[in-house]
From Swiss-Prot:
Disruption phenotype: Both tacA1 and tacA1-tacT1 can be deleted without an effect on growth in cell culture; in the absence of tacA1, overexpression of TacT1 causes a long lag phase. Acetylated by TacT1, mostly on Lys-51. Can be deacetylated by NAD-dependent protein deacylase (cobB) in the presence of NAD(+). One of its GO terms (biological process) is regulation of DNA-templated transcription. The lineage of its organism: Bacteria, Pseudomonadati, Pseudomonadota, Gammaproteobacteria, Enterobacterales. This is Antitoxin TacA 1. The keyword Transcription regulation applies.
């Protein structure tokens, strides 16, 4: 989960208007998952927001942000034995 704040105690109120049919649909889905309407709405909204953020293809950085981004990309990767083992395996299509 990108924003762990989605799991924290609520400290702000969100108000929204919906059609009866929308509320009924949301309530039905929430009931299937054994969640309250509020929990269902907040969890699915956070998931959708994370997807939008993670699917970004264009990033607008100022010079300082761009330099930090490039430094992170150029930083050496920590050794990971699991990844090394995976990369050492012969692909199934080469067997």
């Amino acid at each position: 989960m990108l924003y762990k704040g989605c799991l924290m105690k609520s400290d702000v109120q969100l108000n929204l208007r919906a059609k009866e049919s929308q509320r009924a649909l949301i309530d039905a889905a929430a009931e299937i998952l054994h969640k309250s309407r509020t929990d269902f709405i907040l969890e699915t909204a956070c998931q959708a927001a994370e997807k939008v953020i993670l699917d970004r293809r264009v990033f607008n950085f100022n010079d300082e942000q761009y330099e930090e981004f490039i430094n992170l990309l150029d930083a050496p990767v920590a050794d990971d034995p699991v990844i090394e083992k995976l990369l050492a395996r012969k692909p199934q299509w080469d067997v």
